[in-house]
């Protein structure tokens, strides 16, 4: 730690009334751009309007003004999030069977949407149990409401109204901090203060207050619910907070108050701050007492972290010092200059944050099934599948976004004249070695992983099962993964002496948790089939990275186009008269990367869906015999391409294809509609601009003949616009098709 003489006090850094609020200005489309504000000459105008409305870099080059716009937009985003949350809670309050579900979560499905009968839609309202007819939801809200201690629809109403108030507050804040009191640039660049507030305030106090809520409200209410007490009989949340005797009846150590804390006799609190591991056999979720303990521990860590950086007092770390000291024997100047990049380029900052958040979101996807955090979540198979799929897609999009903004940083904000021999410069100087090696890895992985399947299909087709790669013939066991599983399964008592069970049942052992005759979780065996598909995962991920990284490293220049930086982030080709230079812009790499991201995530969610139905999910008899949904067919069927098509895609699509006339029929319609949206994208991806321009001019001629030609001249989509429309429909159609396929299947059989 570096201790210096006290630095001068930091002043309040805002400008008062910098920009006047003007509705006339807002009402003028394109007011942010001199060209667009003139109004439309051609139909390209509407595309440019949408493309540039939030591209604040194109409105002004003043970093302070850009920062203020981004800051203000964040409040608008938060407002929308609060509005969305309010809607979710309102549906729970007004249209749901939450109270019925709470009283019997194993026999009643969650529903918070009832379809109005207009022309026969009431068929969509299926019987979810308990006499309630509605659409079964798979968002996990019921489970999280129960975990947080909500026992009535009135409480959901109040929360919904509270969220609306916060939404209004955020809208006001967005206006206030742009028009009334806008921060100066120095405020946005004061990273130590920002770290302190975000770490100690948002994450530290946020986790602490959640831990407090869990201990004082969630735990006692869930104790009562688990014991079968009628929700209407349970005391209200504020009674637990105000009346310590109520809590002391459930957790006797509460009677002693804070004495054990100050006398360091912390083990007294082990009644409600536990370290058990494994799952609660009543609910099939993590022990809520473990979760409360976790949030308390996390809060302490973040509160400490929030006090590590030097602000008004001359004590603590400075980020600039840390970065500049960060150099090894082979890394030249190391991280020197990184501080300046991250405080003057919000694209660089955003890129880093998106990469981290995307990876974290994918980690969340895996934790949601391996360590199901909420009561009765693990036995709600539709919700489990939805949560995994949702978090995988979101993570994939965020990671592609990271590459997009890294490339925008390279094109717009990177200054090669000031960067010499730091890590970024060194990476750029040996980018050819990086990309060519990565390319070799992709070719190797692609041929070998796919080759294993092709071998199996060929042997299977020729009737030679003994020559296939499988658990019963030539084994390719994932020995490293199995070793990691065993290490974790054996951890309790060795590395974690206080824990009674390992972190997740999936690691191994003999434990099985079933709730209401349904499997919540059991050890997940890994075999040859998983070895094969994991190498497909490796292949698709590496190709995605190859495309995205090439886009970033060659964003400013390449051997083909040395002056690429002058052409900008997105451009169709290097001008007329230079063939073979199309699809080289950084934007095009993001465009291509999106398709491979879609590939990668699709294989992951297919693997998950089939593996869980085959080896985990199912029912358990009174004798303890488990019957899995697809009877353990993953290990032998998924080792051929034909098996994936026949026993996964085709066999499991029967529910969505045969859904007509049932309450799942909407999924059947979506399945068809989304296939159409996907196919529609190909029209944009496989056609040239000139073809459409010719057609348009012929149609305009006909309009002129009839004297109904518009004043705005119609234009074909530009190459980039066509690709943008294409990839959007490709992804939207593909994701919605998968959604309909998964949900119709799992709601029918789960």
UniProtKB/Swiss-Prot annotation:
A GO molecular-function descriptor? magnesium ion binding
Give the Enzyme Commission number.
1.97.1.12
| Any single GO CC term annotated in Swiss-Prot or TrEMBL for this entry | chloroplast thylakoid membrane
What EC class is this?
oxidoreductase
Q: Which organism is it from?
A: Populus trichocarpa
| Protein topology in the membrane | Multi-pass membrane protein
| Residues that hold chlorophyll a' according to the record | 675
Q: How is the cofactor bound?
A: P700 is a chlorophyll a/chlorophyll a' dimer, A0 is one or more chlorophyll a, A1 is one or both phylloquinones and FX is a shared 4Fe-4S iron-sulfur center.
Protein localization? Plastid, Chloroplast thylakoid membrane
The name under which this protein is listed is Photosystem I P700 chlorophyll a apoprotein A1
Q: Which reaction does it catalyse?
A: reduced [plastocyanin] + hnu + oxidized [2Fe-2S]-[ferredoxin] = oxidized [plastocyanin] + reduced [2Fe-2S]-[ferredoxin]
Assembly and oligomerization: The PsaA/B heterodimer binds the P700 chlorophyll special pair and subsequent electron acceptors. PSI consists of a core antenna complex that captures photons, and an electron transfer chain that converts photonic excitation into a charge separation. The eukaryotic PSI reaction center is composed of at least 11 subunits.
């Amino acid at each position: 730690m570096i201790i210096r003489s006290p630095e001068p006090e930091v002043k309040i850094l805002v400008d008062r009334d910098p920009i006047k609020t003007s509705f006339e200005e807002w009402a003028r489309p394109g007011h942010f751009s001199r060209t667009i504000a003139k109004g439309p000459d051609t139909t390209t105008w509407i595309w440019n309007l949408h493309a540039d409305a939030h591209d604040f870099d194109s409105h002004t080059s003043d970093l302070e003004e850009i920062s203020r716009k981004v800051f203000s937009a964040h409040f608008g985003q938060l407002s929308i999030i609060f509005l969305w949350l309010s809607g979710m809670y309102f549906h729970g309050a007004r249209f749901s069977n939450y109270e019925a579900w709470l009283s019997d979560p194993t026999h009643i499905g969650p529903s918070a949407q009832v379809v109005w009968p207009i022309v026969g839609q009431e068929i969509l309202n299926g019987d979810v149990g308990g006499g309630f007819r509605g659409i079964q939801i798979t968002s996990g809200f019921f489970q999280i409401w129960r975990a947080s201690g909500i026992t009535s629809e009135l409480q959901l109403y109040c929360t919904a109204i509270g969220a609306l108030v916060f939404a209004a507050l955020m809208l006001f804040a967005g206006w206030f901090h742009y028009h009334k009191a806008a921060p100066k640039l120095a405020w946005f660049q004061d990273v130590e203060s920002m770290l302190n507030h975000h770490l100690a305030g948002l994450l530290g106090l946020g986790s602490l207050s959640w831990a407090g809520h869990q201990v004082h409200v969630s735990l006692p209410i869930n104790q009562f619910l688990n014991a079968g007490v009628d929700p209407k009989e349970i005391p209200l949340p504020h009674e637990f907070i105000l009346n310590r005797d109520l809590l002391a009846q459930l957790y006797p150590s509460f009677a002693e108050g804070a004495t054990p804390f100050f006398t360091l006799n912390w083990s007294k609190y082990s009644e409600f701050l536990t370290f058990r591991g494994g799952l609660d056999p009543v609910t099939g979720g993590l022990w809520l007492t473990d979760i409360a303990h976790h949030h308390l521990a996390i809060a302490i860590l973040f509160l400490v972290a929030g006090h590590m950086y030097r602000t008004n007092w001359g004590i603590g770390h400075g980020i600039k010092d840390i970065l500049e000291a960060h150099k090894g024997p082979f890394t030249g100047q190391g991280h020197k200059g990184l501080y300046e990049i991250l405080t003057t380029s919000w694209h660089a900052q955003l890129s880093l944050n998106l990469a981290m958040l995307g990876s974290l979101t994918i980690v969340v996807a895996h934790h949601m099934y391996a360590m199901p955090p909420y009561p009765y979540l693990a036995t709600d198979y539709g919700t489990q599948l939805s949560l995994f799929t949702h978090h995988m897609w979101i993570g994939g999009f965020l990671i592609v976004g990271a590459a997009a903004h890294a490339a925008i940083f390279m094109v717009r904000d990177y200054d090669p004249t000031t960067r010499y021999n730091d890590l970024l410069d060194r990476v750029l100087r040996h980018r050819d070695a990086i990309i060519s090696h990565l390319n070799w890895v992709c070719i190797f992985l692609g041929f070998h992983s796919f080759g294993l399947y092709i071998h199996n299909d060929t042997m299977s087709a020729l009737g030679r099962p003994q020559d296939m790669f499988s658990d019963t013939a030539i084994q390719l066991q994932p020995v490293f993964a199995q070793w990691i599983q065993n290490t974790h399964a054996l951890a309790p008592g060795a590395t974690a002496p206080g824990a009674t069970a390992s972190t997740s049942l999936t690691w191994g052992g003999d434990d099985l948790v079933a709730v209401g005759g349904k499997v919540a979780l059991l050890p997940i065996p890994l075999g040859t089939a998983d070895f094969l598909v994991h190498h497909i995962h490796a292949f698709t991920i590496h190709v995605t990275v190859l495309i995205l990284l090439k886009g970033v490293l060659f964003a400013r220049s390449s051997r083909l186009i040395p002056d690429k930086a002058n052409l900008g982030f997105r451009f169709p080709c290097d001008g007329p008269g230079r063939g073979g230079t199309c699809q080289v812009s950084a934007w095009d790499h993001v465009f291509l990367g999106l398709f491979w991201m879609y590939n990668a995530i699709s294989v992951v969610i297919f693997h998950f869906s089939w593996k869980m139905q085959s080896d985990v999910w199912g029912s358990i008899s009174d004798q303890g015999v488990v019957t899995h949904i697809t009877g353990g067919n993953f290990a032998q069927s998924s080792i051929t391409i034909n098996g994936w098509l026949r026993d996964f895609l085709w066999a499991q699509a029967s529910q969505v294809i045969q859904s007509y006339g049932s309450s799942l029929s909407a999924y059947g319609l979506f399945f068809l509609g989304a296939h159409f949206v996907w196919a529609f994208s190909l029209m944009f991806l496989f056609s040239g601009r000139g073809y459409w321009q010719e057609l348009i001019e012929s149609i305009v001629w006909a309009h002129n003949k009839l004297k109904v030609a518009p004043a705005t001249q119609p234009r074909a989509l530009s190459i980039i616009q066509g690709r943008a429309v294409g990839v959007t429909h490709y992804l939207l159609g593909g994701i919605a098709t998968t959604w309909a396929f998964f949900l119709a299947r799992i709601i029918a059989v789960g």
